Regions:
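Sec-dependent signal peptide recognition
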Residues: 2-9
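OB-fold and OB-like single-stranded nucleic-acid-recognition modules
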Residues: 21-161
Length: 161
C-alpha cells in the first residue's frame, strides 16, 4: 500500500502521455474536388526528398489494383489514381496499402478513391504516391485511411498509439 501513490502517479503520467501523442482522425471529404488535393499539389511543387505526413488525395482509379507480393515489409496493393490538382493539371498518383497493416485494399478501374497518409515523390509513371494509409505508427502522423467506392479501410483507429 505504501507504493500506491507512486503507482497512481505513474499511471496518470502514462495516461496523459498517450493523449499528447494521440493521432488525429481526419474525416473523409464529402466529395472529391481539386482543393482536396492541395497538400499533394504543394508536395509536388516543393519536391521534398523526405516523405511528408498527412497528405490527402482523391481521384479515379485508372486501372485495377496491382499486387506486389513479398518484400521486407510484406505484400502491398498499388492503386493508380488520376488526381486533378487545384491548378487544373491532372497527375497519376500511386496509393500503396500494406496487406499486413491495412488488409488487401483493391479498386477496379473507374472506382472513386480517397487516400490519406504519408506522401512522397514517385518516379516513372507516377508523379507522387501516398502510403502509410493505416492507423498511425509514428509521432506527427494522423491516422491514415483509404476509401474505395465508398468503403473505408481501416474502419476506425484507437485514439492513442
Amino acid at each position: 500500500m505504501r507504493y500506491a501513490p507512486r503507482l497512481a502517479l505513474i499511471l496518470l503520467m502514462v495516461s496523459a502521455g498517450r493523449n499528447v501523442f494521440a493521432a488525429n482522425n481526419v474525416p473523409v471529404p464529402a466529395h472529391c474536388a481539386p482543393q482536396v488535393n492541395q497538400k499533394l499539389a504543394d508536395l509536388l511543387a516543393q519536391h521534398p526528398r523526405q516523405n511528408v505526413d498527412n497528405v490527402m488525395a482523391c481521384g479515379i482509379a485508372t486501372q485495377n489494383t496491382q499486387v506486389r507480393r513479398g518484400g521486407p515489409h510484406g505484400s502491398h496493393h498499388i492503386t493508380t489514381i488520376a488526381v486533378k490538382l487545384p491548378n487544373g493539371q491532372t497527375v497519376n498518383v500511386q496509393i500503396v496499402t500494406n496487406d499486413d497493416l491495412d488488409g488487401p485494399v483493391t479498386a477496379q478501374a473507374n472506382d472513386p478513391v480517397f487516400a490519406y497518409g504519408q506522401g512522397y515523390i514517385a518516379n516513372g509513371r507516377w508523379a507522387a504516391g501516398i502510403h502509410d494509409t493505416h492507423c498511425s505508427t509514428h509521432r506527427g502522423a494522423d491516422n491514415g485511411w483509404v476509401v474505395v467506392a465508398g468503403v473505408k479501410t481501416p474502419k476506425s483507429c484507437a485514439n492513442f498509439r
